[in-house]
């Protein structure tokens, strides 16, 4: 597998791999986002779901209760406060269309990690299409700000040695085509 460069990412963005696409790194007085040498820094939207214990008492990934979360929408350039030792879901501004021969891996930005805020996103499988749901953990004993419309994580694109036999689209992945924040699903 080879790591793809800014040249390749820019070329693929013209084919709709990332929309909207920012051709350069933007980062003055904000958490940076946009194209980097070997990746793309994604932005978090202004919609969040914060976990709460009001109205529910158990988190079950096989039978998720929507009462476990409170929906919050911030101003376009506002922020969301994630409570101490708590968890939030958000989504990317960007919509992705991953090529069949590519797997993308997402890593949290060090700006947030150095504040005790951990970002997790599972790999973007070949032929996945949709917004990315972002998992955000505040590991600190203090409230933490997440800035809407600013950088949150970096995506690295890896091209396979050969094209996969079965893509995410082929297997009708449960999160295919997701728009907005998508809560956990189990295929029944």
Swiss-Prot record:
InterPro entries: dCTP_deaminase (IPR011962), dUTPase-like_sf (IPR036157), dUTPase_trimeric (IPR033704). DCTP binds at residues 109-114, 154, 168, 178. Pfam families: DCD (PF22769). Its EC number is 3.5.4.13. One of its GO terms (molecular function) is dCTP deaminase activity. It catalyses: dCTP + H2O + H(+) = dUTP + NH4(+). SUPFAM superfamilies: dUTPase-like. Keywords: Hydrolase, Nucleotide metabolism, Nucleotide-binding. Pathway: Pyrimidine metabolism; dUMP biosynthesis; dUMP from dCTP (dUTP route): step 1/2. The active site is at residue 135. GO terms for biological process: dUMP biosynthetic process; dUTP biosynthetic process; nucleobase-containing small molecule interconversion. Homotrimer. PANTHER family: DCTP DEAMINASE. Catalyzes the deamination of dCTP to dUTP. Belongs to the dCTP deaminase family. This is dCTP deaminase. It comes from Helicobacter hepaticus (strain ATCC 51449 / 3B1). The lineage of its organism: Bacteria, Pseudomonadati, Campylobacterota, Epsilonproteobacteria, Campylobacterales.
């Amino acid at each position: 597998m080879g790591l793809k460069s800014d040249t390749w990412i820019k070329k693929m963005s013209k084919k709709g791999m990332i929309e909207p696409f920012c051709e350069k790194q933007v980062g003055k007085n904000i958490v940076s986002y946009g194209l980097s040498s070997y990746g793309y820094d994604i932005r978090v939207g202004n919609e969040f779901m914060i976990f709460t214990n009001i109205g529910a008492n158990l988190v079950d990934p096989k039978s998720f209760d929507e009462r476990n979360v409170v929906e919050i929408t911030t101003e376009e350039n506002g922020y969301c406060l994630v409570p101490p030792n708590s968890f939030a879901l958000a989504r990317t501004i960007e919509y992705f269309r991953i090529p069949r021969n590519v797997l993308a891996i997402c890593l949290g930005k060090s700006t947030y990690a150095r504040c005790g805020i951990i970002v997790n996103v599972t790999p973007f499988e070949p032929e996945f299409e949709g917004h990315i749901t972002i998992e955000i953990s505040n590991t600190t004993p203090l409230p933490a700000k997440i800035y809407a419309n600013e950088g949150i994580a970096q995506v690295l694109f890896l091209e396979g040695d050969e094209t996969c036999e079965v893509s995410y689209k082929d297997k009708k992945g449960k999160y295919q085509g997701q728009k907005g924040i998508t809560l956990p699903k189990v295929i029944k």
